[in-house]
Regions:
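Active-site-proximal cap/loop segments of hydrolase catalytic domains
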Residues: 1-107
Length: 107
């Protein structure tokens, strides 16, 4: 399904194009990346959690600075549709807390 929109990895031209902007394949060794909080869910059927784990691990391994690279795994959750309001509020609170902490914003 994705090949129609993005191209097929079996076509060399498509493959080279995909790799050129792949978030995973464009992580540079030793670059000073900003603080990152990657969100995934254990039952996501659109973005397989393994992709988020691999991206986070690669970013951690190649990080040249000291900023944290973290992954947050939502339990019993999917891609977002039908998520309870309580869970949405908690996720937003976590994201804002991480962002404010990393920016040094006091309260």
């Amino acid at each position: 399904a994705w090949a129609v929109e993005y191209g097929s990895i079996e076509d060399k031209m498509h493959f080279n194009n995909l790799v050129s902007y792949s978030p995973l394949h464009t992580i540079n060794v030793g670059a000073n990346y900003p603080s990152v909080l990657v969100y995934t869910a254990d039952h996501d059927d659109r973005v397989v959690p393994a992709h988020s784990f691999k991206y986070t691990a690669t970013l951690q391994a190649r990080q040249g600075g000291t900023n944290p690279i973290l992954v947050r795994i939502g339990k019993s959750a999917g891609h977002g549709a039908g998520k309870p309001t309580k869970k949405i509020i908690k996720e937003y609170a976590e994201k804002w807390a991480f962002m404010f902490y990393e920016m040094g914003v006091g309260y």
